[in-house]
């Protein structure tokens, strides 16, 4: 696409501080009505001013006016802003840092302030990260505020902290003089205000302690000239000022709401415009927003400051990946609506079941949906190549790549680093780079113009999918060899510094490895944006989309591989400081630019024409900041580059016939030459309350679940046992063994004394995991539910809770006791279940600890095996022509309830019919497909990859695939009725 709209669903790669516009526009009349209901006055005369206000929306739907607030620095340091008690506390802490710095001896300042800074940095990335993670998943901070009642007016008599209430009210209303009332504001907003004051303390102390640490480490290197000192300080100040501009411009765009992670608490209904720094780089607050750290390191001329800056920067990226990005995906990028089932008439379904497939090279013929997919422009991506998680040694491409890499590694390590071998490795790297750029470029150029690669495979009866697979393998092998040979050459040319403190050795290694990391990040970002199809130039082989999509790193750069994608090569050149590696890096850069200009660009222009954008976000921002004469100069340079490449193209076109003639002559001579010359002790500590008087007879657990299929019951006595064990077991009571369906929800009913602890909880365990009945010694791993709502600072532990503390009178007790009981119900489903087979039990625990008060009956989760012989024997109309259709229909019937269980019976993703498509969340979260894979393996003995489940997309396609897989594997089966097996005695006699 030409440009990407700024909707939250489409900017998933942005940082949290780049909050996107709301999902819907504000209905002013509805807002006025909601505000009036909440007690806010809205008059007709103020209609014009209302359009400038920001409205917030809490998770429960409450709409409120979000008042204007000021940034942290202005609030603390501006004399025009009113000061609060918390402001003076922050200023006092900052002053304490300065006093400590002055009081310490110079030699002690470095270690002390390194420790202080790391404390505040850990508080930032670890402490704030932990708070935000729990707020995002469990609404923890708001629940704390609710339980502590610190925002409840003391006049009601419910607030146990009236002094804290008055202090917070005075501070907040002083800090926000307009459009704000502490008593009327929503709980979420007040909680956010308190949270941002904590953030103010941490951020200010983090930056202040860093600056003091840099000041303690600052020095001037020996023998440094005045010119070098001037340049060093000038470059440092440029980076610091650039950092300051990034922060100010980012705050101008996102305001305090996103600056302080406001959408972890509430959302705003407002259109946000993102420009400036957000067009320059991804996550500018965390990427280019840390340039000042390196500027300060440069001015301090200290490796200590540089390395602690790198550690802080890495911690910030970890904070982004682990805390912010998951929240962004959950809030702003929900799964799209699922595809509903498409109704077919009976004739279509009959034709679908009885369709015959033509022989193809794959072991599994294409399913009905696969046949439709073959008419689509792009192939389905099931068995990807890139990434260690996609490594498959059964695939010839992967095994070849691994073997060749081992060979390169062995040659690199075992050969000496003499000039001869150095020259050999450098020449090898140059040859592979030439092949990777020129050879691959020639193939793609021919494919773009004449479809020559595809035509070759069609000539031998193959299809486009086979051509695509072979191309991916060739390109993947070429790419890995290109970089492996470069790494080998770098290793041969590298010499370990004898003195790391001499010269710029340490700095060059640091910058070099940083450039390598930058190239790795760029490659990962490119792959995330393009996918497997784009990475392997899929639009050279299949019809492309009518509109380009600029997402991810391509929002900022048109061709990121042109500069950032080669940063690691220059990093290696910087580390080795050898002319040969510099030559390889320069050669690689020139060839890559030529590949983009001569191969990629013409093809993209042919496909997309005017829809190709001219300038990316970064270029637009830079052009806007340049004066008009320099902008014209940039256009002139672009024209000169285009004319130069056109001249080179014309030169190559004119020389091609002569080169072709020479190559043919060389090949003939070479062939003639080859023809001529062939040749422990456990002590359990019980809670005092348990020993003090709780009667264990008052506690009980009863469970209900969906019984497993009859085949699962039969498999317990299948003829493999001794003679006496084949008969059903004799039972002396009316209770039978509990065998439940795989993945089906399990309802748990509990009873406890009326005065039981509100922090009691029930957990699910495997029977073999706990050897003691009175104490649980294994963690529940999230498979637990609290008996009462609000007892824990987590929403997850309340998921599945149905009822609590329903009184059961003594007259209804079965054991004859005369005490009333409390009871409740809960349902374990989804992530609270074990997704495997085995024997399990529920345990009731006391007061948030692991003392066991009651244990349920053990129950088994078993998946019955599918027996096609039974299916055929039950159908009297079975013939050889319709047996496959009957078996496939039976597989569909057996598979549908299992798939629904694997998808948590969620109406958004679980299918209702055989043809209904799976929800899009199945593609995002791999756990659902892995559950189905396990169930299919247990039921049918067929092992599928999770990617196949996602690609099939519905139960009918999966049933078809399983049916055909069983047919393919039938010759290797020991079944009597299916496939070619060893002849039986009767068959021998008949023969």
From Swiss-Prot:
- Taken from the record's topology, the Cytoplasmic segments are 106-111, 219-225, 301-302, 422-423, 496-510, 600-991
Q: What Pfam families does the entry give?
A: PEMT
What InterPro entries does the record tag this protein with?
A: Phopholipid_MeTrfase, Phosphatid-EA_MeTrfase_fun
**Basic and acidic residues bias: where?**
11-21, 717-730
One biological process GO term for this chain? phosphatidylcholine biosynthetic process
Bias (Polar residues): 1-10, 352-361, 706-716
User: Which molecular function GO terms apply here?
Assistant: phosphatidylethanolamine N-methyltransferase activity
Specify the protein's topology with respect to the membrane: Multi-pass membrane protein
Does the keyword Amino-acid biosynthesis belong to this entry?
A: no
Q: Which reaction does it catalyse?
A: a 1,2-diacyl-sn-glycero-3-phosphoethanolamine + S-adenosyl-L-methionine = a 1,2-diacyl-sn-glycero-3-phospho-N-methylethanolamine + S-adenosyl-L-homocysteine + H(+)
This chain's function reads: Catalyzes the first step of the methylation pathway of phosphatidylcholine biosynthesis, the SAM-dependent methylation of phosphatidylethanolamine (PE) to phosphatidylmonomethylethanolamine (PMME).
State the name under which the record lists this protein. Phosphatidylethanolamine N-methyltransferase
Q: Native species of this protein?
A: Talaromyces stipitatus (strain ATCC 10500 / CBS 375.48 / QM 6759 / NRRL 1006) (Penicillium stipitatum)
Gene that encodes the chain: cho2
């Amino acid at each position: 696409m030409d440009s990407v709209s700024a909707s939250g669903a489409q900017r998933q790669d942005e940082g949290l501080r780049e909050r996107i516009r709301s999902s819907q526009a504000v209905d002013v009349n509805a807002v006025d009505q909601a505000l009036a209901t909440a007690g806010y006055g809205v008059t007709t005369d103020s209609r014009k001013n209302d359009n400038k206000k920001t409205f917030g929306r809490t998770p429960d739907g409450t709409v409120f006016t979000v008042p204007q607030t000021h940034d942290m620095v202005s609030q603390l340091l501006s004399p025009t802003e009113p000061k609060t008690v918390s402001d003076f506390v922050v200023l006092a802490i900052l002053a304490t840092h300065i006093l400590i710095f002055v009081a310490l001896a110079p030699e002690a300042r470095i270690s002390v302030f390194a420790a202080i800074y790391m404390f505040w940095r850990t508080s930032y990335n670890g402490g704030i990260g932990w708070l935000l993670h729990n707020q995002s998943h469990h609404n923890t901070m708001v629940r704390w505020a609710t339980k502590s009642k610190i925002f409840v007016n003391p006049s009601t008599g419910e607030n146990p902290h009236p002094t804290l209430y008055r202090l917070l009210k005075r501070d907040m209303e002083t800090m926000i003089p307009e459009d704000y009332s502490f008593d009327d504001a929503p709980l979420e907003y007040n909680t956010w205000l308190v949270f941002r004051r904590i953030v103010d303390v941490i951020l200010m102390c983090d930056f202040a302690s860093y600056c003091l640490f840099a000041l303690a480490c600052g020095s001037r290197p020996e023998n440094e000239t005045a010119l070098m000192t001037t340049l060093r300080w000038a470059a440092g100040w440029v980076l610091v000022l650039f950092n300051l501009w990034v922060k100010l411009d980012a705050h101008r765009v996102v305001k305090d709401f996103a600056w302080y992670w406001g959408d972890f608490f509430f959302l705003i209904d407002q259109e946000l415009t993102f420009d400036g720094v957000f067009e320059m780089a991804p996550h500018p607050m965390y990427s280019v927003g840390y340039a000042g750290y390196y500027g300060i390191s440069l001015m301090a001329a200290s490796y200590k400051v540089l390395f602690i800056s790198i550690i802080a920067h890495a911690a910030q990226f970890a904070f982004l990946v682990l805390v912010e990005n998951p929240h962004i995906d959950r809030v702003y990028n929900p799964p799209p609506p699922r595809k509903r089932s498409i109704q077919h008439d009976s004739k279509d379904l009959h034709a679908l079941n009885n369709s015959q497939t033509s022989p193809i090279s794959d072991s599994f013929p294409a399913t009905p949906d696969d046949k439709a997919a073959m008419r689509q422009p792009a192939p389905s991506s099931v068995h990807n190549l890139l990434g260690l998680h996609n490594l498959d040694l059964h695939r010839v491409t992967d095994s070849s790549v691994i073997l060749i890499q081992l060979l390169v590694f062995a040659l690199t390590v075992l050969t000496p680093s003499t000039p001869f071998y150095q020259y050999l490795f450098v020449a090898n790297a140059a040859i592979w780079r030439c092949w990777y750029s020129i050879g691959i470029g020639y193939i793609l150029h021919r494919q773009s113009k004449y479809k020559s690669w595809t035509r070759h495979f069609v000539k031998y009866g193959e299809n486009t999918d086979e051509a695509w697979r072979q191309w991916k393998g060739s390109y993947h092998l070429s790419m890995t060899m290109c970089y492996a040979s470069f790494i080998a050459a770098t290793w041969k040319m590298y010499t370990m510094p004898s003195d790391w403190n001499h010269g710029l050795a340490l700095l060059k290694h640091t910058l070099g490895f940083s450039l390598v990391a930058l190239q790795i990040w760029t490659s990962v970002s490119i792959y995330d944006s393009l996918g497997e199809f784009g990475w392997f130039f899929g639009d050279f082989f299949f019809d492309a989309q009518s509109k380009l999509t600029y997402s991810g790193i391509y929002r900022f750069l048109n061709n990121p591989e042109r500069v950032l994608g080669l940063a690691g090569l220059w990093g290696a050149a910087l580390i080795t400081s050898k002319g040969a590696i510099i030559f390889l890096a320069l050669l690689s850069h020139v060839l890559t630019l030529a590949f983009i200009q001569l191969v990629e660009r013409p093809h993209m222009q042919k496909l997309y024409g005017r829809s190709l954008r001219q300038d990316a976000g970064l270029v637009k921002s830079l052009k806007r900041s340049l004066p008009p004469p320099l902008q014209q100069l940039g256009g002139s340079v672009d024209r000169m580059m285009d004319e130069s490449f056109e001249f080179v193209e014309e030169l190559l076109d004119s020389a091609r016939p002569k080169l072709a003639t020479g190559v043919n002559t060389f090949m003939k001579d070479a062939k003639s030459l080859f023809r001529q010359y062939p040749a422990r002790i456990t002590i359990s500590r019980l809670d005092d309350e348990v020993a003090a008087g709780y009667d264990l007879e008052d506690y009980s657990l009863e469970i209900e679940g969906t019984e497993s299929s009859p085949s699962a019951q039969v498999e317990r006595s299948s003829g493999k046992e001794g003679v006496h064990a084949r008969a059903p077991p004799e039972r002396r009571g009316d209770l039978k063994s509990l065998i439940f369906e795989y993945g089906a929800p399990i309802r748990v009913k509990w009873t406890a004394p009326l005065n039981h602890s509100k922090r009691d909880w029930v957990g699910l365990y495997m029977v073999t995991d706990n050897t003691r009945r009175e104490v649980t010694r294994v963690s529940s791993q999230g498979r637990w539910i609290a008996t009462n709502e609000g007892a824990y600072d987590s929403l997850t532990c309340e998921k599945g809770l149905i009822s609590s503390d329903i009184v059961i009178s003594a007259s209804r007790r079965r054991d004859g006791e005369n005490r009333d009981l409390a009871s409740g119900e809960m349902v374990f489903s989804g992530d609270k279940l074990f997704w495997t087979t085995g024997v399990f039990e529920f345990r009731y625990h006391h007061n948030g600890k692991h003392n066991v008060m009651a244990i349920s009956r053990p129950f088994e989760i078993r998946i019955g095996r599918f027996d096609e012989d039974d299916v055929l024997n039950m159908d009297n109309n079975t013939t050889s022509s319709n047996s496959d259709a009957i078996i496939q229909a039976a597989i569909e019937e057996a598979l549908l309830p299992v798939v629904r269980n694997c998808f948590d019976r969620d109406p958004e993703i679980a299918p209702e019919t055989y043809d209904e498509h799976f929800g899009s969340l199945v593609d995002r979260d791999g756990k659902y497909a892995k559950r189905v894979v396990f169930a299919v393996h247990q039921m049918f003995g067929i092992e599928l990859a999770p990617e196949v489940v996602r690609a099939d997309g519905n139960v009918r396609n999966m049933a078809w695939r399983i049916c055909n897989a069983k047919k393919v594997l039938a010759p290797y089966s020991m079944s009597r009725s299916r496939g070619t097996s060893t002849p039986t005695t009767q068959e021998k006699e008949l023969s």
